[in-house]
Amino acid sequence: MNIFIVVLLCLTGVAIAEQCGRQAGGKLCPNNLCCSQWGWCGSTDEYCSPDHNCQSNCKDSGEGVGGGSASNVLATYHLYNSQDHGWDLNAASAYCSTWDANKPYSWRSKYGWTAFCGPVGAHGQSSCGKCLSVTNTGTGAKTTVRIVDQCSNGGLDLDVNVFRQLDTDGKGYERGHITVNYQFVDCGDSFNPLFSVMKSSVIN
């Protein structure tokens, strides 16, 4: 009987150590293991495939654009109302204003804004200005947003206008949140002089 209890306690300890994702407060798996939809760490397709609702360190992590992806993440909304403030990061008291407030208007207004504290990706200053492709898992509505702030909900805190754009069935507004998948994507901010020259010669 004592051996059974010891084995049971050992198995329970191992299981608890492997919990991750929203079931464990946004915790990531050790050793870059994937976090399954059920909140357990592993390395097979059952854990790592977005088709199986992998939560973090998923196989299509998109590391090439510097951040990764996560599934089934909580997204709330925040009243930045950036268009009412001239897309001014200082007026919105956004965390990233320290580094990005002097970016051109075209850069600041290119995408809707979000605060970021998701389970996968850099946080703090290194996340500022990066872009996410965000998909509402309930409706399939999709948009690209720019990170301008930090949050504490373990996911995203979208500008209310972006939230409305994704909340096409209105259920998110009723609940106060939507469930989303996000992936870091290239913002397309790079200036390519060759492209600009080619574009102007085509116009002329």
Swiss-Prot record:
Propeptide, residue positions: 61-66
UniProt-listed Pfam families: Barwin, Chitin_bind_1
Barwin domain residues: 68-189
Family matches, as SMART domains: ChtBD1
Tissue expression: Laticifer.
GO biological processes: defense response to bacterium; defense response to fungus
Entry keywords, A to Z: Allergen, Chitin-binding, Disulfide bond, Signal
Limits of the Chitin-binding type-1 domain: 18-60
Free-text description of this protein's post-translational modifications in UniProt: Proteolytically processed to yield the two chains of the mature protein.
Residue ranges crossing the lipid bilayer per the database entry: none
GO molecular function, one term: RNA nuclease activity
Signal sequence, renumbered to the chain: 1-17
InterPro entries assigned to the protein according to its UniProt record, in alphabetical order: Barwin_CS, Barwin_dom, Chitin-bd_1, Chitin-binding_1_CS, Endochitinase-like_sf, PR4, RlpA-like_sf
SS bond list: 20-35, 29-41, 34-48, 54-58, 96-128, 117-151, 131-187
Role, per record: N-acetyl-D-glucosamine / N-acetyl-D-neuraminic acid binding lectin. Can inhibit fungal growth.
Protein name: Pro-hevein
